[in-house]
Amino acid sequence: MASFDWVIIKRMAKYFDINEQGCSIRCKLYCDDPDAVKRVAVCCHGFASSKESTSYQTFAQRAVAKWKGTAVIVFDWPCHGEDARKNLVLDECTSYLRLVVDYAKSRFNTDELYAYGVSFGGYLLLKYLAENGNPFRKVALRCPALDMHRALIDVIMTSDDVAKLEAGKPVLIGFDRKVRISPEFMDELVSFDLLSREFFDYADDILILHGTADEIVSFDVARQFAEDNVIEFVAVDGADHRFHDPKKMDAALARIIDFYRS
């Protein structure tokens, strides 16, 4: 990224914490003028990533620049980034998202909310919608990990990790930061079968973009899920899970922002 872009991002970005209900959620806000915010996009990062991922910085820069009055909030899930929790629990992830949504509404006095979820973040967004309804005008998902349990077992974990879990022991796995995964967390993933849920009520407000070369989560599963729920699905030819190709990432972000504005 050019140095000029970094200057813009540093000027736009502000750190803050949400300290509510026993939670301390580390957040990053992007906006030009906090007093002129009309709408907020909430970003939900993937497994073992964080609010500092450059992909969210790029998304925030584009959204704020192209749609006046837009703010973007990125936050760390439990056990991710700067978060202090040690054990990953699905219900606590739901609580974090609910508190961020409530903060965005009250801080900026707006109900015009949007969501952008990637991989595990996409899974958690859909779980939130299934259990709590949809507080967002539009929801964009990039390579959502619709079967998170299988992604962990088949791709992210080693055979030794799986053996430890089967023996009732937690394991440390991940990328930017290692995340402690317990047998109980894996049981939670099995208990909440996202693929069996229906999202017809929200289908018109959901967009899924998925790379055909995704090496982490199944492209075919995502496509079938979208078809079953009548959700718009955009196949990005040759894109891997993280959209390493800058041109493919740029095109995806432009498509998401256009979707928000439609």
Set out the residue ranges of the language-model regions.
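Catalytic nucleophile-loop/oxyanion-hole region of alpha/beta-hydrolase
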Residues: P78-F108
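Short, surface-exposed "cap/lid" segments of acyl-processing enzymes
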Residues: D33-W77
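N-terminal cap/lid segment of alpha/beta-hydrolase-fold proteins
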Residues: F4-P34
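Short beta-strand immediately N-terminal to the catalytic nucleophile in serine-hydrolase-like folds
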Residues: A115-G117, R142
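The alpha/beta-hydrolase serine catalytic core
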Residues: I25, L88, P135-Q224, D228-A235, ...
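Gly/Ala-rich beta-loop-alpha elbow adjacent to hydrolase catalytic centers
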Residues: G117-G121, L125
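Short beta-to-alpha linker loops that shape the active-site pocket of alpha/beta-hydrolase fold enzymes
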Residues: F47, D76-G81, A145, A239-D240
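Glycine-rich His-Gly loop
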Residues: C43-F47, S119, G211
